[in-house]
Amino acid sequence: EIGLDGFVPELNTPEAFAQQQLFYKAQLKLAKQYQLPVILHVRRSADLLLKGLRDTPVMGGIAHAFNGSLQQAHAFISLGFKLGFGGALTYDRALQLRRLAVELPLSALVLETDAPDIPPHWLYATAAQRAAGQTQGRNEPAELPRIAQVLADLRGISLDEVAAVTRANAIEALPRLK
């Protein structure tokens, strides 16, 4: 996984962010040289990542935990990327993400868990619940079928179709998964 993190404060000092950009560009060059797909860490950095991909085209990959705009989604897709959707999709309040999951072609989506991070809503414990002693549920790959069911319900299609298409998409994005 390569990319830029525009969210974590200590990674966003001018020096740290410049270093992130330096590493990102170097990693893109390696991916291009060795004809490897990349999994992109896209955290408040989609436009800068897209610029890097236009400057150094690679064979595609996955924009992990995608949470950008429709325009950014289409830009990643046009560059050969699939968009990763996971636990965040399960939250009713994730309106933009849910809208994207319905509006974008299913052929552009892959499912992921980001385990143990980004838990689906059924595992999430609020700060108040955690303060009261409730533990945060542990996200793991076993949650993927339920996340897939959420996507199927949002799109009004079968779980089997979501599973088959997103599996094929993952193999297309990361051919060595075969």
Segment roles from a protein language model:
Residues 13-111, 119-122:
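Catalytic pocket-lining loop regions of alpha/beta-barrel enzymes
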